[in-house]
Regions:
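An active-site-proximal "capping" alpha-helix that borders the catalytic cofactor pocket
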Residues: 184-191
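A glycine-rich dinucleotide-binding beta-alpha-beta segment and adjacent secondary-structure elements
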Residues: 106-173, 179, 186
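Glycine-rich loops and low-complexity Gly/Arg-rich segments
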Residues: 58, 178-180
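Short acidic, glycine/serine/threonine-rich loops at helix termini
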Residues: 40-42, 181-184
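A generic structural motif
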Residues: 34-36, 175-178
Length: 191
């Protein structure tokens, strides 16, 4: 678990340090645009204005809390077999997985916003057409991998790269919202 507050589920970045377990895993992500996130929040009675600097953070929190509720609490993550996920079905059972403290079969369309759920469904089906063995009910979808990049971007001057109001403060890499991983963070640092 990678949650940072009570009542949320985050499954990002967990693998045993020796990388010697029998399971493979990967994170699949969907781009979240501000207008779509604002619409989603309005439907859920959260009325932050579209230009609010913490709008995407509020969106992230809503999804993580939905995962916690559907997962049954105690950091048990909601999950579905891949073909069941793409067919909007609740899996009758789940295979073993590396995520501890465990998984709970759940309707992920109730956890993920519709546009995220639909985009993932289409992506998984497309992968299945290109990679033999990818699209199978032996694979599982676990919710939610919601911390791939910062939902907040700290402003910086385009030329000098420092904060526009604080001299000698140089926002960069993942935490400042300018990268989404180790390689892109290193590239931003080089800049």
């Amino acid at each position: 678990p990678a949650a940072t507050a009570p009542g949320e589920i985050v499954v990002n970045g967990w693998s045993p340090s020796k990388r010697d377990n029998p399971y493979a895993n990967s994170g699949m992500v969907v781009q979240i645009d501000v207008p779509i996130a604002a619409n989603y929040l309005k439907k859920n009675k959260n009325s932050l204005p579209e230009n609010h600097p913490l709008l995407l953070l509020a969106f992230q929190k809503e999804v993580e809390q939905a995962a916690f509720k559907v997962g049954g609490g105690l950091q048990v993550a909601p999950a579905a077999r891949l073909i069941d996920f793409c067919s909007n079905k609740v899996s009758t059972n789940l295979p073993d997985a590396s995520y501890l403290p465990g998984l709970h079969s759940a309707p992920l369309n109730e956890v993920l916003p519709h546009f995220v759920h639909h985009t993932l469904q289409e992506g998984f089906k497309a992968f299945g057409k290109k990679m033999k063995g990818y699209y199978t009910n032996d694979a599982i979808v676990v919710a939610t991998e919601s911390r791939t990049s910062s939902p907040v971007r700290i402003p910086r001057d385009a030329d000098r790269l420092h904060h526009p109001q604080i001299k000698n403060l140089y926002p960069c890499a993942e935490g400042a919202g300018y990268a989404g991983g180790i390689v892109s963070a290193a590239m931003d640092g080089q800049k």
